[in-house]
Amino acid sequence: MPAAARVPLFVDDLVMVGVNYKTSGKELVEKAQFPDPLAAYSAISRIPAVREVVLLQTCNRVEVYAITTNKKATVESIKSLLEARAGEPIPEEKFVIYYGTDAVRHLFRVAAGLESMVLGEPDILRQVREAAEFAAKEGYIGKALKLTFENAVRVGKRVRTETALGKGSIGIPSASVKLLEELIGLEGKKLLVVGAGMAGRVVAVNAAKRGAKVIIVNRTLSKAKELAEEVGGEAYPLEELPRLLREADAVVVAVGGGSKVITRDAVAEVNKKLVIVDISEPPAVDPGVSLNPYVIYKDMLAVAEVANRGLEKRKSEIKRAEDIIEAELNKFVNFAQRVLADKILRELMEKVEQIRINELSKAMAKVPQEYAEVLDKMTSSLVKKVLKDVILKVREAAGKGDLTTLRIVAEVFDLKESLNNIEIIYDYNGVEQELKRKLEL
């Protein structure tokens, strides 16, 4: 079937391309991050086939969700953009790529916390919501992805409400703050946050809420200042770190790149208690810092222990969470199919009604005026009876997910809007009521 004759159903036109900690490792995820989301949106939206886009970036993933008229070309273009950001070729097996219903399922799983490094962690739900809100504010999201992300957030909330998957769960950055709270208490303490990326922001925000005096240290001073302003803290370049270490009570290091930002020599002059927590991957703190008796060093494993408290209980909830997701996925896809059916029927009825009115006008010019009401009722009744089986077949096809039948109906009746318009009207309650009124069904 020619591309122009296709009846688009937005789920079919959805792709997701990305990298995450499972397939690529956190170091590659860090490299692939887009420091300027607006520049990323601009680049992705220039891909000719892309109609809508949402960029979901967290500490553990960079994922691009797009509605497109050419899935293959769009996937290849997004892969190229991610490779350009990473500064290196990315092997095929390190990409995560989903199409259509599988892409929706993946997003629902992400929002529910099933794909998180810490099972059920709560931060991801907020991040999914904020990603869609940012795309909407900047004009890159349309009706399809708006509906998809709204449902993902709703499903994520339902999973957390109806299961214990997220009970007691926190992400790694939040867990590092909890660990410090348990070790030294954060109220009034001077905390250095090394790194102003996603993880650093979570640490800084949570620590500030607990009363810590937050100092952001980053290679790029402008980014440090931006985050410091958000949390009411101070900002310094990385070169100031050795001096700051002597004054701090605690440090959380959340950087990428693989180099050591805190070495044994860097803490040689520390002469009061200092807790250093490294949540970088790969590690960015030399374990030898613990040779200084004043330094308490905690690595990712120590933080993971805090994050994974109650993990076995949460694991037992995975099946229930997955059942909820599959049920919601079926409802979501069927909803989209029903919307398409309503769109076809509305366009069909409008077209047939216009033909009826035109032909009725011609007939009325040749018969006495007193027959007008009779002819109007007769032709209206005739149209309803002729189209009744078509309407039932369209409804039945939508219920079965039979897009072939829906396409055939749209082609036979030359329904141009249904054939060529990529967007679908999602709020169809008014359409349904109008159809019921017209057809008396």
Swiss-Prot record:
It holds the Pfam family GlutR_N. One of its GO terms (molecular function) is NADP binding. Its EC number is 1.2.1.70. It comes from the Archaea. Substrate binds at T58, C59, N60, R61, S116, E121, P122, D123, Q127. Keywords: NADP, Oxidoreductase, Porphyrin biosynthesis. The record marks H106 as: Important for activity. Pathway: Porphyrin-containing compound metabolism; protoporphyrin-IX biosynthesis; 5-aminolevulinate from L-glutamyl-tRNA(Glu): step 1/2. It catalyses: (S)-4-amino-5-oxopentanoate + tRNA(Glu) + NADP(+) = L-glutamyl-tRNA(Glu) + NADPH + H(+). Gene3D superfamilies: Glutamyl-tRNA reductase, N-terminal domain, NAD(P)-binding Rossmann-like Domain. NADP(+) binds at G195, A196, G197, M198, A199, G200. The active site is at C59 (nucleophile). CDD domains: NAD_bind_Glutamyl_tRNA_reduct (cd05213). GO terms for biological process: protoporphyrinogen IX biosynthetic process from glutamate. SUPFAM superfamilies: Glutamyl tRNA-reductase catalytic, N-terminal domain, Glutamyl tRNA-reductase dimerization domain, NAD(P)-binding Rossmann-fold domains. InterPro entries: 4pyrrol_synth_GluRdtase (IPR000343), 4pyrrol_synth_GluRdtase_dimer (IPR015896), 4pyrrol_synth_GluRdtase_N (IPR015895), GluRdtase_CS (IPR018214), GluRdtase_dimer_dom_sf (IPR036453), GluRdtase_N_sf (IPR036343), NAD(P)-bd_dom_sf (IPR036291), Shikm_DH/Glu-tRNA_Rdtase (IPR006151). Belongs to the glutamyl-tRNA reductase family. During catalysis, the active site Cys acts as a nucleophile attacking the alpha-carbonyl group of tRNA-bound glutamate with the formation of a thioester intermediate between enzyme and glutamate, and the concomitant release of tRNA(Glu). The thioester intermediate is finally reduced by direct hydride transfer from NADPH, to form the product GSA. Possesses an unusual extended V-shaped dimeric structure with each monomer consisting of three distinct domains arranged along a curved 'spinal' alpha-helix. The N-terminal catalytic domain specifically recognizes the glutamate moiety of the substrate. The second domain is the NADPH-binding domain, and the third C-terminal domain is responsible for dimerization. Homodimer. Catalyzes the NADPH-dependent reduction of glutamyl-tRNA(Glu) to glutamate 1-semialdehyde (GSA). NCBIfam families: hemA. This is Glutamyl-tRNA reductase. It comes from Ignicoccus hospitalis (strain KIN4/I / DSM 18386 / JCM 14125).
